[in-house]
Amino acid sequence: MNLIQQLEQEEIARLNKEIPEFAPGDTVVVSVRVVEGTRSRLQAYEGVVIARRNRGLNSNFIVRKISSGEGVERTFQLYSPTVEKIEVKRRGDVRRAKLYYLRGLTGKAARIKEKLPARKG
């Protein structure tokens, strides 16, 4: 492990951020700290994770949602101080790591099948 990787690992440990397990296809609610003038508030951004890039401290993910009939995508840094918390609403069952094809789909075609828990027995 080189020096930069070691420093990144120490920084991640210092941040002590609670990050749930999530993958592309999952529907998540990202609580973002928004500062307006002197006031600060939390804004919830709910959508489908279409990509995740794991690069240590520089990890990020893209969340896509439909707002007023228009597709909106937002990229979040995983360890950013503006990202307050990430909550997984539902697990999606997909076979791709990057779901960029959802950009061209609308309505029912853009739905993602829900991943059901494994049956025991």
From Swiss-Prot:
One example of a Gene Ontology biological process annotation: translation
Cellular component GO terms, alphabetical: cytosolic large ribosomal subunit
Highest taxon above the source species: Bacteria
Keywords (A to Z) from UniProt: Ribonucleoprotein, Ribosomal protein
SUPFAM superfamilies linked: Translation proteins SH3-like domain
GO function term, MF aspect, one: structural constituent of ribosome
Pfam family, one: Ribosomal_L19
Record function comment: This protein is located at the 30S-50S ribosomal subunit interface and may play a role in the structure and function of the aminoacyl-tRNA binding site.
Annotated family: Belongs to the bacterial ribosomal protein bL19 family.
Other facts noted in the record for this chain: Present in outer membrane vesicle formulations which are used as vaccines in human.
NCBIfam families in UniProt: rplS_bact (TIGR01024)
Annotated protein name in UniProt: Large ribosomal subunit protein bL19
Organism: Neisseria meningitidis serogroup B (strain ATCC BAA-335 / MC58)
Gene behind this protein: rplS
